[in-house]
A protein has these predicted regions:
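Conserved small/polar residues in nucleotide/adenosyl-binding loops
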Residues: 155-157
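An extended acidic
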Residues: 49-144
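Conserved, mostly hydrophobic/aromatic
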Residues: 18
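Short, Gly/Pro- and small/polar-rich lid/capping loops
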Residues: 1-10
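Hydrophobic/aromatic beta-strand elements that line small-molecule binding cavities or substrate pockets
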Residues: 149-151
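Short, surface-exposed, low-complexity cationic segments
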Residues: 26-44
Length: 157
């Protein structure tokens, strides 16, 4: 299957004929990038999770796999105001003037085919059998924001 989610290891793995893309859900429900590159057959790729030994003195979390600093971790969907000082993928401001956003993994869906993105450029497939889609649902419990991250794997690239 082009997209798998290992619930036990909490790893998403997306395969095309030539490439693999993988990310991991931490014990604190943050999404961390694991790998993108040449296709790999392994299903257990948590050994690729990079946990630095020497964390800088910045806010960090400890989720049982060692502490990780948001400023050093390869966050899959970086947001602003949560100790990651790199460029965020989005910025918002709520009605109270707060701009912090922290997205936590909530659930996912894997299905054949691809939803249309109205008004946006997108890849396409001739039939639903040529593409598998992954939707990762994230929530920010502080401001009620719900985010859907969409991924797809095309069989013929």
């Amino acid at each position: 299957m082009p997209i798998i989610y290992d619930e036990k290891k909490r790893v998403f793995k997306l395969d095309t004929p030539n490439t693999t893309y993988a990310f991991h859900v931490t014990n604190s429900n943050h999404l961390l990038h694991l790998y993108y590159g040449a296709s790999i057959p392994e299903t257990d790729i948590t050994h690729m999770l990079r946990i630095p030994n020497d964390e800088p003195f910045v806010p960090s979390t400890h989720d049982g796999m060692g502490p990780h600093s948001f400023d050093c971790a390869a966050i899959e969907f970086p947001t602003s105001g949560v100790a990651d000082f790199r460029e965020p993928c989005m910025q918002l401001m709520d009605k109270y003037g707060m701009s912090a956003c922290e997205c936590y993994y909530d659930s996912c869906a894997i299905y054949k085919g691809k939803k249309k993105l109205e008004g946006l450029p997108a890849t396409y497939a001739n039939t639903d059998d040529e593409v598998t889609s992954l939707e990762v649902y994230c929530k920010d419990p502080h401001n009620g924001l719900e985010i859907t991250l969409q991924y797809l794997s095309l069989i013929h690239i």
